[in-house]
A protein has these predicted regions:
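Glycine-rich FAD pyrophosphate-binding loop
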Residues: 13, 25-47
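Conserved N-terminal helical subregion
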Residues: 5, 57-61, 72-163, 170-178
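Beta1/beta-strand and adjacent pyrophosphate-binding region of the FAD-binding site
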Residues: 2-16
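Conserved N-terminal glycine-rich FAD pyrophosphate-binding loop of Rossmann-like flavoproteins
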Residues: 40-60
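Conserved FAD-binding catalytic core of PHBH/FMO-like flavoproteins
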Residues: 144-145, 150-250
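FAD/FMN-dependent oxidoreductases across multiple families
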Residues: 224-307
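C-terminal helical "tail/cap" subdomain of flavin- and related membrane-associated enzymes
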Residues: 297-375
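N-terminal Rossmann-fold NAD(P) dinucleotide-binding loop
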Residues: 19-20
């Protein structure tokens, strides 16, 4: 029928990995879901994901983990180090289970999108004005008319909202460089975060049977050429990783830390649309998974159509979002503004984590996604 209206529970705008995983999770709970994306094909993102223990459990529960083509690389230990006080160092590990894994973003996205296409719930090539997408009002998708009870935006950190949204930004002049390098020594399944004089440099073991391949994220105030990035990697990792050969393809990203709110009814923000942070924490994607888990858990407890459902969701995600944004902003500030007071804060923080076991255990659990549940 030409004027038929299709009634659905959820419309998810944005078929990136977080939005797609939410769609799959809600469908498994028997909700009627459509997910729309402006692109027809997956953008082949060659980057990796740092997947903490909680996110790995989630991917396992929805039937994704064991289907990943390239076996994810294990993270057994995390080393945090800085250039102050003779390269003071923190070492974190958990003997009960891996602290995390590293997998290729694109491989997980392919699995999820294949499932969604088979379920006929995804529509590509749709580019609607986000301000005109409203719940309980007719939305036309490919000439068909739909009504959705709830709208979920998972359109990423650069989403442009205007009416009914407030966006708190945390300005930073940092830009991030992401790339890969091969090395002559075994990486020993160790992840590193080194606070260099030039900015935070993270190196993670990348999926590879020979264990001689790693990925890096370097965030800095100044532009760096490929030879300059190689020089920084060699300075900090030649001892642990041996001879380093940098891959030519380097990705460059501007950073846009923010926390966005809305009081519009039946509108949910998810993942980087809700909050985006500096990659120094390495937890942005994992927080998106927690958004999914929180929302799905709430559908078991409350009517998702009720006025208070959105308020409860935002209340549960607000504290963790603010905590991570505040922490990453503070870390960047004290390193970007070297002085006696900021050096004192850094030294004190390192010593506290070195000496107090309960604090170390809390840090480990939080990094693994097994920490305090924010309510």
């Amino acid at each position: 029928m030409k004027n038929q209206i299709h009634n659905y529970d959820f419309l998810i705008v944005g078929a990136g990995l977080v939005g797609s995983l939410l769609a799959l999770s809600l469908i498994k709970k028997k909700f009627k879901v459509k997910i729309i994306e402006k692109h027809h094909q997956i953008l082949k993102d060659q980057r990796t994901l740092a997947i903490n223990a909680n996110s790995k459990d989630f991917l396992n529960q929805i039937g994704i983990w064991n289907k990943i083509k390239t076996q994810p690389e294990v993270i057994n230990r995390i080393i945090i180090q800085d250039h102050l006080d003779n390269n003071q160092k923190l070492v974190f590990e958990n003997r009960e289970e891996p602290m995390g894994h590293v997998a290729y973003n694109y491989e997980i996205q392919e699995i999820v999108r294949s499932k969604l296409l088979k379920l006929k719930c995804m529509i590509g090539g749709i580019n609607l004005n986000q301000d005109n997408i409203k719940a309980n009002e007719i939305i036309v998708l490919n000439k068909s008319r739909y009504l959705f009870k709830k709208i979920i935006f998972a359109t990423g950190k650069n989403a442009n909202f205007s009416k009914g949204f407030s966006k708190k930004t945390f300005p930073t002049k940092h830009k991030s460089y992401v790339g890969f390098f091969s090395h002559s020594k075994n990486h020993q399944n160790i992840a590193y975060e080194i606070f260099t004089k030039n900015g935070p440099l993270a190196v993670l073991p990348a999926p590879s049977k020979k264990k001689n391949y790693s990925t890096f994220i370097f965030s800095t105030l100044e532009p760096y050429s490929i030879p300059e990035q190689l020089k920084i990697l060699e300075k900090n990792f030649q001892g642990s990783h041996g001879a380093i050969k940098l891959k030519k393809k380097i990705f460059e990203f501007s950073l846009n830390p923010h926390l966005t709110k809305t009081k519009l009814e039946n509108i949910i923000l998810l993942g980087d649309s809700l909050r985006s942070m500096h990659p120094v924490a390495g937890q942005g994607w994992n927080l998106g998974i927690k958004d999914i888990q929180t929302l799905c858990d709430l559908t078991d407890l409350y009517d998702f159509r009720s006025n208070y459902f959105d308020e409860i969701y935002y209340a549960k995600r607000q504290l963790e979002s603010v905590a991570y944004l505040g922490m990453t902003s503070m870390i960047n500030y004290v390193y970007d503004h070297p002085n006696f007071f900021n050096h004192f804060i850094i030294r004190t923080s390192f010593k506290a984590l070195q000496k107090f076991k309960p604090l170390r255990n809390l840090f480990i659990k939080q990094a693994m996604g097994r920490g305090y549940t924010f309510v």
